[in-house]
Amino acid sequence: MLRRSLSVVFGRRTIACKSCGIELQNKIKDGPGYFVTPQKAIRPAAKQLELAKQLLYGERLRIEKQLTGPDRNTLEKWKELVPPSCKRCMDALHHNRYDTAEFPEHTLEDVGKGVPRDAVVYHIAPLWQFPMGLDRRVLQSSKKVCVLFSKIDMVVQRPSHMPQDVGAFFQSLLYHDLHVKITNFRFFSALKQWNIQTVRNALSKESYLLGGPNAGKSSLINALMRTVVYESRRLVSSKQSSATPADLPPKAHLDIHSAGVSTIPNFTRQPQQYDIKGKIIHDVPGYRTSKSHTFDFNSMIQKDYLLRLRKSDSKTYLTKKYTSINGTESGRCYTVGGLFYYVPPAQTINQVTRYMPGDPQKFQSIDKGLEVVRDVYSDRWDKETGSHPLAEYIHVNPALGDKNSFVRHVIPPFQGTIEIVMRDVGYLRVVATGSFKFLGLHEIWVPKGIEVSVREPLTDVFRTTIEAYRDSGSVANVAQMIIKRPYISSTYPMAHNETDPLAKMREMYLERTASNLSARRLMNRDPLELISQKQKERVNLYWHYCW
């Protein structure tokens, strides 16, 4: 059917790859959009055998089909209806073979060309990565913007922990920091089908999904389709849907119309349109939301671990196990796979919970950890001597055995618990235990090109927000929370040999707030005196997020 008519279709109009949306062609093998026409195996005796089976066991086969579902021949016919995918997508999806050069990054300017000025934009960002993933250019645009936070199952254990009241926090924060008035927030998990109906109700008649790579746009499309299977379809053009028989079961219908989903960033290459119960949704390719996101995950991280990192689910993220680490004068550190090194101040006791795959390790110092990485790849390990004892715990490639490949991020002072977020990697929850005493600043050393931010624990913030909002029934109470202190902050990258990080941090803080003096706080207080005393409430000195 569809396969047989492909040559005719190519003769009069183009068709797009089902997975990435690029225009298909079968002329240039190494060109974009190349696909191979499937060749169906011909079995001369198959037709005669099928006829004999129908004559001998026709009624029995009909009853069995009703009880067990479609037979193999029917399944093959359904597969023929699935639109074709290009070779790049087929290799990536089914064989995990891909060349990163075929997955180039897009910019907001690139993808924005296809978004009308009066469009309603739904800005999608993974909740676990907050505040990174939100793009101030989209939030401050002249378009009507709604925010959809995805992958909430990586932060909370059940959807009831994310009521709509939580939106008051984000509404107040964005108004305070960016002076934008956004009131429409939704929180969902496509994997768990959480709050998908709520998202569908919030969509306008025509919507454009904008967000970074792997934000969850295509996954949301598929989750929406599952709520109204037979009233959802992929559109060949803005007014024409791909035709399907009326007797298809739900799974076959979804196979034909679903969006292409992959853990590989920049998988979608061209905008694709879908009709979800009369609402037109434009799935726009992911674009680079980071200002300086240059880290090459594919060359720096072992491929098997990178796959685990990108496929992380709630079981990985919502672990309850923590690792205790005592800070030392030598700089004892905590790492997962050699991808980063968290260094607590000397004489402090801390509990670290990882929200990423891999087993944590502790080393006497960063230099010792880097030495282990280099030793894992040294020539002294071969088939006879075996591998390094810690080889299974190292997930980075040799280039990350060099200290110069890392940036020293100093974390602003905090009291109690914080979360350290690494873009596209995961996050750590750090709990400072024992009696309060300021003994120095915490640090995390991360490869160049990976952005880092810190925040108060999201679940704690949500709990406080819900209480404040329900006490008054107004956003005003929540707005007062935001005015009182910042809840998110950028880190402070410093030289490896900086000996007075607190003084340097103050200097950098003044530079960052020079164009927004109203953001400055506690400048008339002695910083050391302020952070050396336990406060009734957090003060979050020098906390400031650079949007």
Curated annotation (Swiss-Prot):
Keywords per UniProt: Mitochondrion, Transit peptide
Alphabetical list of PROSITE patterns matching this protein: G_CP
Signal peptide range in chain numbering: none
Entry-linked InterPro entries: G_CP_dom, Mito_lipid_metab_GTPase, P-loop_NTPase
Major location category of this protein: mitochondrion
One Gene Ontology term, aspect cellular component: mitochondrial inner membrane
GO molecular function: GTP binding
GO BP of this protein: maturation of SSU-rRNA
Range annotated as the organelle transit peptide: 1-22
Domain CP-type G: start-end pairs: 105-290
Subcellular location(s) per record: Mitochondrion
Annotated S-S bridges: none
Sequence similarity: Belongs to the TRAFAC class YlqF/YawG GTPase family. GEP3 subfamily.
Function: May be involved in the mitochondrial lipid metabolism.
Protein's name according to its UniProt entry: Genetic interactor of prohibitins 3, mitochondrial
